[in-house]
C-alpha cells in the first residue's frame, strides 16, 4: 500500500513518440527524494498502443483531475536537458513528458509542443 506521503515517485516519459494509433515506447522514471533532492533509481520500459496514457500504471484510486487526464502523443512537452542531467539522465536520449501535470513542479519545462 502506498500513501501520498511516500518518498517514492514514478514519472512517465515518452522515449520514442509516434502518431496516435502507433505504438510508443514509454519509460517510467523511478526516483526517491532524499533530503529534498531527487535520486534516480532507474528506468522501467513499458509500451503503449493507440493513445499515450498519463501517469504510471496503478489500480483505480482517487486522483486530481490533472493526473487523470489523458494526453495525446502530439501534445507532449520536451524536458529541459539541463534538468535531465540532475537525474543523471543522458540528454541525447532525451525523453518527452507524458503527463505535464504529473511531473514534479521543481522540474523546469520548456513550453514547446512536440509535433
Swiss-Prot record:
Annotated signal peptide: none
Superkingdom field: Eukaryota
GO cellular component, one term: nucleus
Keywords: Apoptosis, Nucleus
Keyword field contains Zinc-finger: no
Organism (species): Homo sapiens
Full protein name: Putative TGFB1-induced anti-apoptotic factor 1
Tissue/organ expression: Not detectable in normal kidney and liver. Up-regulated in chronic and acute allograft rejection: expressed in the inflammatory infiltrate and in tubular epithelial cells.
Amino acid at each position: 500500500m502506498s500513501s501520498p506521503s511516500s518518498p517514492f515517485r514514478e514519472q512517465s516519459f515518452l522515449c520514442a513518440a509516434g502518431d496516435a494509433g502507433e505504438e510508443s515506447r514509454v519509460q517510467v522514471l523511478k526516483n526517491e527524494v532524499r533530503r529534498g533532492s531527487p535520486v534516480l533509481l532507474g528506468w522501467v520500459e513499458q509500451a503503449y498502443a493507440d493513445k499515450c496514457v498519463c501517469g504510471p500504471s496503478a489500480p483505480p484510486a482517487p486522483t486530481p483531475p490533472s493526473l487523470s487526464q489523458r494526453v495525446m502523443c502530439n501534445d507532449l512537452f520536451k524536458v529541459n536537458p539541463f534538468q535531465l542531467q540532475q537525474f543523471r539522465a543522458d540528454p541525447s536520449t532525451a525523453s518527452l513528458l507524458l503527463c505535464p501535470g504529473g511531473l514534479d513542479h521543481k522540474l523546469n519545462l520548456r513550453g514547446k509542443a512536440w509535433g
